[in-house]
Amino acid sequence: MRKIFLYFIFIFFTFNNSFACQLLNVPIGSDISNASSTFEFLDDYNEEVFGKNNSARYEDYAADFCDGSDLKGTDLEVIVYQSKIAGINLINSDQENNNLIYEFAKNFIRDPGEQVKNKDWKGYVDLSVGNLVIAYTKTNVGDEIFEYLEISNIEMFDYTID
């Protein structure tokens, strides 16, 4: 009986992380009518306004969509193409906390590696899983460090590029 109880506790905590981060529960390529239950700001999307060949970008605070993460000061960018979710990006430019997205990726997706925590490290790490294209990037813009996590899929990736 004790083993069964421990098993249920383990399952609860395993699934609790992903359910607490609603932004990871929105499938790339899904219709915005489904995604708007998580991202209410998508209710304003109108494909006719953006045209058939243009993507729309919406921004909000990432922390509002991911309980249990430390994404304070991190921007969430949701990219919509032809009424479908083309990409979900996290962007952090907080110079005091420049490894927030690293911690998020490590806890919710996969560890990009300890080397990316180094303040001097700049580059890209492929964290792709299945048909999801996931990239962790750290770069300089001027004197500031920017951290990115970009999530898309093979079919929608081209529509996430400006």
Predicted regions and their residues:
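Sec-dependent N-terminal signal peptides
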Residues: I4-N16
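Non-cytosolic coordination micro-motifs
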Residues: A20-A62, Q82-D162
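Short, compositionally biased low-complexity segments enriched in polar/charged residues
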Residues: Y58-Q82
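Generic detector of short alpha-helix boundary/capping microenvironments
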Residues: F8-I9, L23, L71
